Amino acid sequence: MRTLCGEDKITAEEIEFLKSKDCKIGLVIRDLTEIQVSTANGTLDAFRAVETAKELGVPQNVGIALFAEIKPEWSINHNWMISFAQTISENGYVPAFIGNTDSSKNFNFDRQCSHFVQATKDVDYFGAVFMYNRSSAFC
């Protein structure tokens, strides 16, 4: 996985190379803040990610995931997750989240993710929840 924005973001040339090799692409959104993800509306954050992906030439409607990275110490709002996922999905990408579900460290992500799954179980907004902890690599 590569980042969608920031210092080591993926380039348009890399996107083209990966597409030519029929590779799966997962892009991480690392410029979010706790203030943003703890609000009730993630629509603007999602539109910003979608526009960045389009500018880089990331193809739509081919199963490419845009992962919102949620830091382990952050609080998050499941309504932010729902509106973020809905906007990402409506724009041709797979909504996904990276977060630490180790409830002994921060129960908030685990609880809010559960609310998100329950609230979206009858719609196709759920992409993936990618879990990690600081002592291991991505799983």
Indicate where each model-derived feature is located.
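Surface-exposed substrate-engagement region within the catalytic domains
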Residues: 45-62, 71-139
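Substrate-binding cleft of extracellular glycoside hydrolase catalytic domains
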Residues: 1-84, 89-91
